[in-house]
């Protein structure tokens, strides 16, 4: 088994400014997933030009392996503005692993009040898989990482950036996070 570096690179257009001074705008969210034994990558929303077309509210990428004994080594998340890292997070290696089951690591990006975002596949180093999303998120984004055994959810990590009151399950909360909530 060899280690593959799979990079998800989301470039978000300028976020509309708000009067809240605690909110730090960003224009790039880089997510790197380090995993052993990845056999294939599934994605969706491919158009005729082999470009991935993004609907932020529904878009999901799944990385599937035939066995969950590999788990993942780590996940790095960088929040970047004008090529400067303004915040970073690291999720340590997964501890819940099962042999003999299909392992799915799913990553989902939600952008609310977006304006014509789109996505395309990066054609570069074959050891690296990355996607770039461009557009404007006026209210903030939510990024979810889930790890599953077959259809059983093992772990879920959520990163919310910006005005995320719209991300509660009912959609009517008055609470929002003005900076980052992980």
Curated annotation (Swiss-Prot):
Pfam families linked: CrmD_SECRET
Keywords, alphabetical: Host endoplasmic reticulum
Family in the record: Belongs to the orthopoxvirus OPG192 family.
Organism: Monkeypox virus
Subcellular location: Host endoplasmic reticulum
Protein name per UniProt: Protein OPG192
Example of a GO cellular component annotation carried by this entry: host cell endoplasmic reticulum
Matches recorded under InterPro entries: Poxvirus_TNF-rcpt-II_C (IPR010806), Vaccinia_virus_B7/C8 (IPR009176)
Signal peptide: none
Chief subcellular location: host cell
């Amino acid at each position: 088994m060899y280690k593959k570096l799979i990079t998800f690179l989301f470039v978000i257009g300028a976020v509309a400014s708000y009067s809240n001074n605690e909110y730090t705008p960003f224009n790039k969210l880089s997510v790197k997933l380090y995993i052993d034994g990845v056999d294939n990558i599934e994605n969706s929303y491919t158009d005729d030009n082999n470009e991935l077309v993004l609907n932020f509210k529904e878009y999901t990428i799944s990385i599937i392996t035939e066995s969950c004994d590999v788990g993942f080594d780590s996940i790095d998340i960088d929040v970047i503005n004008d090529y400067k890292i303004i915040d970073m997070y690291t999720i340590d290696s997964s501890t819940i692993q099962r042999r003999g089951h299909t392992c799915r690591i799913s990553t989902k990006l939600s952008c609310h009040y977006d304006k014509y975002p789109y996505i395309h596949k990066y054609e570069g180093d074959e050891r690296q898989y990355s996607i770039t999303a461009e557009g404007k998120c006026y209210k903030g984004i939510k990024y979810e990482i889930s790890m599953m055994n077959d259809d059983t959810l093992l772990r879920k990590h959520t990163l919310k950036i910006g005005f995320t009151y719209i991300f509660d399950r009912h959609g009517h909360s008055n609470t929002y996070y003005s900076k980052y909530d992980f």
